[in-house]
Amino acid sequence: MGRTVDADAGAVRFAYPGVSFFVRFEGTSLAMDAASTGVRSYLDVVVDGAVRTLHLDPVARRYVLADVLPPGVHTAQVLHRSETWHGTVTLTRFATDGGFVTPPALPARRLLFLGDSVTCGEALERTPPGPKQPVWWNPRVSYGMLAGAALGGQVQLVCHGGRGLVRSWDGRTDEFNLGRLYELAIADPGRPEGWDQRRYAPDLIVSAIGTNDFNQGLPEREAYVSEYVRLVRTLRRDHPQARIVLTEGAILDGEKKAALRAYLDETVRRVADAWVSRVVSRHYPGDAADAHPTREQHARMADDLVPQLREVMGW
């Protein structure tokens, strides 16, 4: 589940958060051969419901995911916790002392969440004091993943911390922002890998972007709306079966939140398509340690979003 790139000898490469692999095996142990291009990549390993977090090395090696299990059939999920800029992961193979059986089927419903660091789950598992740590990211319990689970759907996350629709948090316009991120499977500027949109046909696309665009002040309205219209029309072209929902996200408040909502309304008006709409996001301020929403706030964000998405989709 999520965007991957095929590599040599059956290996796969991936970088977006939330990319997941589901394995079912009959045996007493499970291992994985993998490596990252950086030193800040983390995975969650969920075996028969028990969760542990694994730190990846930049040198390829074997990781024991589970051992001394009771004989029988077991189910595992391996989920990428980290962002693209933490490192690109190569997963070469899984191994077991028994045999692999048919993995669990993914849900038929498909969701795509486009966004920034909030969608990536930045710092939602923070443990201050001290500086921010890469292990604090956890998309597994982010609002998008929680909403997808509540709606009975699989989820693909396309997100990058600090990025926006037209500019990054510091005002730069020469980095990959949302339109380019959407086109990529791996958004590493040194080695970008394209994504074939035919590989995943979402029923619902949720775009939660804008916080970083507004960090330096209000972006010029016409330029912003025009770019959003262009992106939405691209989404409709690539995925005519999908409903598209725009929302402003959780961090903005006050004048900036009101302005972004107005920009979104204007985007929806110009697109003039019944399959494109806007939903409301409440403000969640994070806490004293970090402005990103906490784990508990992500759960509330999902609770806010799910009824609105059910109404849009008729689910």
Map each language-model feature to its residues.
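N-terminal secretory targeting modules
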Residues: 1-114, 118-139, 314-315
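Conserved SGNH/GDSL esterase-like catalytic core that processes O-acyl groups on lipids
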Residues: 16-18, 84-86, 124, 129-226, ...
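Short, conserved loop/helix-junction motifs that constitute active-site signature segments
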Residues: 106, 236-239
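Proline-centered loop/turn at the N-terminus of a beta-strand
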Residues: 110, 154, 242-243, 277
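Short coil-to-beta-strand
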Residues: 110-115, 199-208, 274-279
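Active-site-proximal beta-strand/loop segments in catalytic clefts of secreted hydrolases
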Residues: 114-117, 158-162, 208-212, 247-251, ...
